[in-house]
């Protein structure tokens, strides 16, 4: 089976500063992969490169088996329909209400009638556990957690195969964060999504990721399950994965798996 994302010998430089050097990574269909690393390690840069938003200095990226950055507009449009990205702060259109935000990509297609768009929007709202009455609220009237859910509903409106999440629980209190993680986990199972996320939150990482890629020293320092990563003897990994908070998050994950 063709991997969803293939990154081969990727290097990234901004001015004189190298962010990545000779980085390679494969993400298979249906898995949940987390990218973690310190500030400036290039996590979000890599996430954006995976879908063609940023051009690497060297190397190649293939998405669903197709090379990116070819300049082929038709290919880019076709690939663009197969993935969606949830940005850290939702990126909702402030002058649109919730319904209009979710309907926007559907209307852009120009081939779906308004009755069907209405039904699809209401379905996606239900999928992210929001009510029909929420459709008529403006973004300024939404809580942080609701903004995340509306942005997720908009992403799901195009029936993507690949979902990319940039700090999906940033700014949420623990209860709302846990609820959002459960929602993503449920949608991953129901829809067979491939999910790639950037996070620094240990509870999110433990609650979602099947595999983790640790970015440090301009490369992928370690790749594997959380249990495998924790066996790697490196200062960043010890500090990130072996602190008291990490142990509590992992213990919570183990308790959930037993239920």
Language-model regions, residue ranges each:
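Catalytic Walker B motif of ABC-type/P-loop ATPase nucleotide-binding domains
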Residues: 163-166
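Conserved ABC ATPase "signature" region
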Residues: 115-133
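Conserved catalytic motifs of ABC-family nucleotide-binding domains
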Residues: 159
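Helix-to-loop junction immediately C-terminal to a conserved catalytic motif
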Residues: 51
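Conserved ABC ATPase signature
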Residues: 138-142, 146
């Amino acid at each position: 089976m063709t991997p969803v994302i293939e990154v081969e010998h990727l290097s990234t430089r901004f001015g004189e500063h190298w962010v990545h050097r000779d980085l390679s990574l494969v993400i298979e269909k249906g898995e949940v992969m987390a990218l973690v690393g310190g500030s400036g390690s290039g996590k979000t840069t890599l996430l954006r490169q995976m879908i063609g938003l940023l051009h690497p200095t060297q190397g190649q990226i293939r998405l669903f088996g197709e090379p990116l950055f070819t300049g082929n507009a038709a290919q880019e449009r076709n690939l663009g329909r197969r993935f969606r990205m949830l940005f850290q702060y939702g990126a909702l259109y402030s002058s649109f209400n919730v319904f209009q935000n979710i309907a926007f990509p559907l209307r852009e297609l120009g081939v779906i009638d308004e009755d069907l768009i209405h039904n699809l929007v209401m379905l996606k709202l239900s999928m992210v556990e929001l009510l029909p009455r929420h459709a008529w609220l403006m973004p300024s009237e939404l809580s942080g957690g609701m903004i995340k859910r509306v942005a997720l509903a908009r992403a799901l409106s195009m029936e993507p195969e690949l979902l990319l999440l940039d700090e999906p629980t940033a700014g949420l209190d623990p209860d709302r964060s846990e609820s959002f993680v459960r929602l993503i986990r449920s949608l991953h199972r129901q829809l067979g999504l491939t999910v790639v996320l950037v996070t620094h939150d240990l509870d999110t990482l433990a609650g979602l990721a099947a595999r983790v890629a640790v970015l440090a020293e301009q490369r992928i320092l370690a790749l594997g399950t959380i249990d495998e990563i924790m066996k790697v003897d490196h200062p960043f990994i010890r500090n990130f994965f072996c602190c008291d908070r990490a142990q509590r998050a992992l213990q919570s994950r183990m308790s959930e798996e037993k239920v």
